[in-house]
Amino acid sequence: MKVITLTGYKAHELGIFSHNHRGITYIKKAFEQQILALIEEGVEWFLISGQLGVELWAAEVVIKLKQTHPHIQLAVLTPFLEQESQWQEASRKKYHDILEAADFVDSITKRPYEGPAQLRLKNEYLVQKSDGLLVLYDEDKPGSPSYYLEVAKKRQQQEPYDIRLITPHDLEWIAQEDEMNDSVDIDNL
């Protein structure tokens, strides 16, 4: 595998409405663990569509890891032009910072939003252009990642295609580990 698509829920689907929400830290840690494993397996390119939420947080992880793994690259393939036009200023700034740090940026349809067909095309395109999918997903709460998974599972029936899930259990484990590390009494070591 050389190319992986990173995705998951939009921030509001997770009940995250602040860039300082503690849950973002756990999501980033989970993606960092998986991305490091993928780098060890030979993955060089990480693809996102630039959607608010998990995709941008995962992109921040890739950008951070480029400092120690300069051979990895980030591509942002937006479903349509100016997808950030209706976002809040803080989200637009974060998005533009990621675009500036990305190694490749393009728009799949090369025109502004026209309808949901552009989003379906985005899912198909990113799955087609990658060797696998790393997705934050809860089977009890399908949400937006289910559209990627549907396309990925169809491809998987035709040919080898790697699908890796980060689950709520993974995030709980990271949160518990973090709490244990915070509660260690240094004086008693």
Swiss-Prot record:
Q: Which Gene3D superfamilies match?
A: 3.40.50.450
Q: Which Pfam families match?
A: YpsA (PF06908)
| Family stated for the protein in its record | Belongs to the UPF0398 family.
Q: Which NCBIfam families match?
A: PRK13660.1 (NF010181)
Q: What is this protein called?
A: UPF0398 protein BH1768
**Species annotation:** Halalkalibacterium halodurans (strain ATCC BAA-125 / DSM 18197 / FERM 7344 / JCM 9153 / C-125)
